[in-house]
């Protein structure tokens, strides 16, 4: 395995573990370190998407079988988690930073958003961890034809 793939895989796992782990912690803690973790979470999410994009392009560019379909669903779940965190948690962080008076409202909103994002990130992790173990499509099905056609096999 080339060193670039090893490095990208390690960065991808580390960034995703930090992003998901801090999201799970914030979902359970009521947003105790919300303001301090928001930017590092976004940086980890961007790094996870960048390295995942490289890995996907390098390892799965010529196939769209069951494994790749599960990976696509996992990517969609993690993208939805990022959108929830950007939109809802970002708004709560701005409200807390601007001193909008009552801190309980923005913290409760951010906690709920982190709970939604945590579920989505858990689904993404399950999909990415299991995608490689799915059996290939049976020969003669439309799924198998799509995979062999995309790989250039006749």
Where are these regions (language model features)?
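Polytopic transmembrane helical bundles with strong interfacial aromatic enrichment
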Residues: 1-154
């Amino acid at each position: 395995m080339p060193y670039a793939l090893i490095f990208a895989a390690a960065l991808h796992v580390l960034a995703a573990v930090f992003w998901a782990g801090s999201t799970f912690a914030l979902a359970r803690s009521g947003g105790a370190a919300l303001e301090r973790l928001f930017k590092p979470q976004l940086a980890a999410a961007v790094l996870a998407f960048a390295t995942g994009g490289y890995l996907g392009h390098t390892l799965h560019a010529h196939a769209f079988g069951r494994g790749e379909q599960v990976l696509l669903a996992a990517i969609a779940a993690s993208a939805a988690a990022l959108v929830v965190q950007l939109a809802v948690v970002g708004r709560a962080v701005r409200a807390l930073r601007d001193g909008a008076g009552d801190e309980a409202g923005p913290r409760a909103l951010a906690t709920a958003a982190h709970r939604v994002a945590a579920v989505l990130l858990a689904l993404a992790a399950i999909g990415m961890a299991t995608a490689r173990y799915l059996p290939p499509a049976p020969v003669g099905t439309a799924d198998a034809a799509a995979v062999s056609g995309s790989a250039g096999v006749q």
